[in-house]
Amino acid sequence: IIVTIIAIMAHTLSMTARPYCDVRKFSIVDGLAANTISDMKQAPDRLMWFGTWNGLSYYDGYSFYTFRDVPGGEDVLSSNRIIAIYPTARNNVWCVTSDRKIYLYSTHYCRFRNTEKSINEQFGINLKVDQLYPIKNGSTWITTKDGNYIIRAILSQEEEVSRELIKVGEHGLRSGKVWYIWGDQKGREWIFTEKGTTIYNHHFSTPLPFKWVREVGGNIFLATPDGKLAAFDEREKLIMIPMPKGDTRINQLNNTGYQPVN
């Protein structure tokens, strides 16, 4: 009897240990804008957004809702084919169309804003977007295909309020070929390029081309592809960390979840 009970308990435990997965398939029949999805992201409010070949969609757990230009309506988008999306800290969504133009979808007003046109008129340029980097403090960085400059846009709760075009050589920017732009817990905005690293509106700038960064317990660690590892201290100075002999490449930095003990 004891053996039987143990066997039943073991079987029950094995059953409860199995993860439950509810897999559902969605298509245009369910309200998705198109069956071809170019990008998908989750906004801070936990809504799932999808960039498709026929507009922008979001899913709230029950239904899909789609936003795009329609015949007879106001034409804002140069194309409904959206290839990349970037939710902001305030739950608006940047959209990049197939011709590399950018638009901001306001979730408050439920409309697209022709940001690309506004930027071109303000700075007298022909913007071709490469990547966007929304930062938690509300700013968004825009990098370009030609690499001659980058753009910093500040967003209010609903709309953009200011933009700044930064050319190579300004604000410590060493190159327009940007690897990554990142905001740390103190609100500092880091720009990582192929020719060096800088913090926007700070004195810190280094020719070391850091490509990876991790923040652990208030400490910031940086690494270059060619094997250089450093810590960033509160004086905004780099402390180089020796690597084991023979290690000449770093492919990534990972946070294991362990925190330093003070």
Per-region residue spans from a language model:
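Carboxylate-rich, polar loop motifs that coordinate divalent cations or form catalytic acidic clusters
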Residues: I1-N262
